[in-house]
Amino acid sequence: MAHPLDFRGNISSEFSYFGRSSVGTDNFNFNSSVAAEVEVTHDLNDNIRLIAHPFARWDEHDDERSRFVLRELLLSANFSNWEINAGVGTVFWGVTESRQLVDLINQTDAVEATDNEDKLGQLMLNVKWFSDYGEFEAFLLPRFEERTFKGPNGRPFLGITVDRDLTTFESAQGDQHLDVALRWTHSVDAWDIGLHYFDGTLRDPLLQVTQTDTGPVLAPRYLLVQQAGWDAQGLYGDLAVKTELIVQGGDEVDLHVETVSGIEYTWVGALSPMQEKEMLPDDWCTPDTRNPFKKLICNDRIDLGLVLEYLWDERGESSNQPFQNDLLAGVRLSFNDTATTDALLGLVQDLDGGATTLSLEASTRLFESFRLSVESTKFFNTGGDASLQAFENESYIKADLSYFF
């Protein structure tokens, strides 16, 4: 039996504006970029599927961001209660909004965005077993992918260039160290629960200041860790309770605990711009209207969600990441329209140093094949937080228009 290719993808144009000049070598305020990605799936037979997901980007200023990467090239086989995946794949774990502590399989593609949501493909052998007692997974990860970083002309700029040529590893095997991960997930009543164990090279590098002939740079060092953790989400009507926790340690990493926990409450239909539609002309609230303003006015049900999360790291100021004692408060709007319009406004407050990060993400579909996304981040009071001081001049607004095919 013939199995046709399933071919889909998108082409996007991105435009960014930075309100202040950077301390980098190229003090531009505007940046443009073009990207394309394709997802191809082909069923070789009823049990075996081939998946390919290439991605390419050209950036106006940052050479490190102009590249071609393979996010997935995976052979997936399903037999009874078993699934085997071999090749380059992408795996996501986590339930919280602000930070996913348990999401450790894939490396962050940091040249794409600052929210750590974009990932590089990971070479893997993944075996899953589905049972009445949950889903059991095992991973063998034979090659490590180094984190990408923006170049000296890239923005947002760290304040000092990361030189990947100076990368070191705790493991004598370098990027060839064999990492191992185990995971169990199960649903119990209102809760979805996940447990994991990881032994291998930590994806988050330690960035060490190093002097070179051209001045100071940051040299990445990747450490070996053993990590155990859990993630859980409970749904009680309109209330979602979320939590992630890890215990992590190694020869060069002090044994410590990190956690993110919080809630999200959704008021369904909390905002209804125009309940009395008889006040409007007869042709306004037709189901097929394409006018975005009319869609907003005529919407019967706009859901309002409130998000609250607490982030904690036992190491405090000695941690190599900024979320040691922080609070996230956010508002999510879901317009429930045919354009799937949504928006998320979030504020992260450092409860020790006083730094504040305000972010906005919003998107809507235009016509049948286009989607417009807007993202903005503003940094306040960064002087008291060493990990955020570099972003003092890096507040930005970004618009992305994508065509899907």
State where each predicted segment sits.
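Outer membrane beta-barrel
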Residues: 41-156, 189, 307, 377, ...
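Membrane-embedded beta-strand positions of outer-membrane beta-barrel proteins
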Residues: 9-11, 52, 84-86, 127, ...
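Repeated loop/turn-to-beta-strand initiation elements of outer-membrane beta-barrel proteins
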Residues: 5, 46-50, 81-84, 133-136, ...
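Residue-level signature of outer-membrane beta-barrel architecture
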Residues: 5, 40-42, 76-79, 88, ...
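Detector for outer-membrane/organellar transmembrane beta-barrel domains
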Residues: 236-349
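Residues that define the transmembrane beta-barrel architecture of outer-membrane proteins
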Residues: 26-34, 66-71, 80, 119-123, ...
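Transmembrane beta-strand segments that form the barrel wall of outer-membrane beta-barrel proteins
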Residues: 11-21, 49-59, 71, 108, ...
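Outer-membrane beta-barrel "beta-signal"
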Residues: 127, 263, 270, 391-405
